[in-house]
């Protein structure tokens, strides 16, 4: 599909972007073009994983990558080239000051052998917003998506077709200023790499996780950058994840503020399915107030639930005090995280102030989680046609 043809899709999907945040040279009209894409096929193809061979997340890469360079004169020609190491100046601003951002999305191969991306325009919107926040160069989202489509098309034989598998797509944009000054970069590099990945829950099982909720650790704050997908948001979480493991938990429930608001689970958005204090059954997730990353799966679950019209769907602050009270009164049905890697992940225990809180997610089916997973699978693998899927 040519880039120009994507305009009809974007007319329905486009989100507002602060185009002028970093000055006029960041206008999207100054962009690389998919029509200029250069192609260099590898002469040394990698060995593809065999049938049934485990696909560990982020460990196996396809034969090719997309690369586009930028300087203060504009974007260079995009090129698909053999997968290779990068050459960076030791003073590169991405290495010293975390002038870097990334995205994560998946392509799925259906039984019809058609490969489809899941709502990629939302990732393009979010990536551009992240670029604006870091004063990195803007780009035309249509052109980048078409370049990504072409890359996947080149490496389409790497897209696994076993149940629950997919091709993970990782676009990255970094500042590449060869200087130790903290400033707006005059050089940047955009690249995209691909990884075949296995099922998050092997065999279709649903395994719940336990969470450490410690208010001493804060992932993001109002006025910060928690709502952008920046590399600098993730590195500091590794220590807290290790602390969770030491305390017998698999993930971290990130709290915020003096009232201990629930924000995210690990790198996932969080949902609570309960009967609210007013007696109404509802699905609630924290609002996009600058602390929450606007997840693609998060938005998809909200959209699906709104379409069903069977219970109230709301974006509202949730505090630990409210959750504790709801647990004591038996009003909580399910708590779960959502994200590109896992889609929907149930929670069965929260360690909070040295107290283990049992979450009855699994005792309740988990009815809603399984329904979400079933619908997502049918859409992503082309079992039923849906406007969310973008054919490669």
Swiss-Prot record:
It is linked to Hypervalinemia and hyperleucine-isoleucinemia: An autosomal recessive metabolic disorder characterized by highly elevated plasma concentrations of valine and leucine/isoleucine. Affected individuals suffer from headache and mild memory impairment. Homodimer. GO terms for biological process: branched-chain amino acid biosynthetic process; cellular response to leukemia inhibitory factor; isoleucine catabolic process; L-leucine biosynthetic process; L-valine biosynthetic process; lipid metabolic process; regulation of hormone levels. Keywords: Acetylation, Amino-acid biosynthesis, Aminotransferase, Branched-chain amino acid biosynthesis, Disease variant, Lipid metabolism, Mitochondrion, Pyridoxal phosphate, Transferase, Transit peptide. The lineage of its organism: Eukaryota, Metazoa, Chordata, Craniata, Vertebrata. It catalyses: L-leucine + 2-oxoglutarate = 4-methyl-2-oxopentanoate + L-glutamate; L-isoleucine + 2-oxoglutarate = (S)-3-methyl-2-oxopentanoate + L-glutamate; L-valine + 2-oxoglutarate = 3-methyl-2-oxobutanoate + L-glutamate. Catalyzes the first reaction in the catabolism of the essential branched chain amino acids leucine, isoleucine, and valine. May also function as a transporter of branched chain alpha-keto acids. InterPro entries: Aminotrans_IV (IPR001544), Aminotrans_IV_CS (IPR018300), Aminotransferase-like (IPR036038), B_amino_transII (IPR005786), BCAT-like_C (IPR043132), BCAT-like_N (IPR043131), BCAT_family (IPR033939). It comes from Homo sapiens (Human). GO terms for cellular component: mitochondrial matrix; mitochondrion; nucleoplasm. It holds the Pfam family Aminotran_4. It is found in: Mitochondrion. Its EC number is 2.6.1.42. Changing residue 264 to K: In HVLI; reduced catalytic activity. Belongs to the class-IV pyridoxal-phosphate-dependent aminotransferase family. Its main location: mitochondrion. The modification N6-acetyllysine is found at residue 321. The keyword Lipid metabolism applies. This is Branched-chain-amino-acid aminotransferase, mitochondrial. One of its GO terms (molecular function) is L-isoleucine-2-oxoglutarate transaminase activity. Residues 1-27 form a transit peptide. Its cofactor is pyridoxal 5'-phosphate.
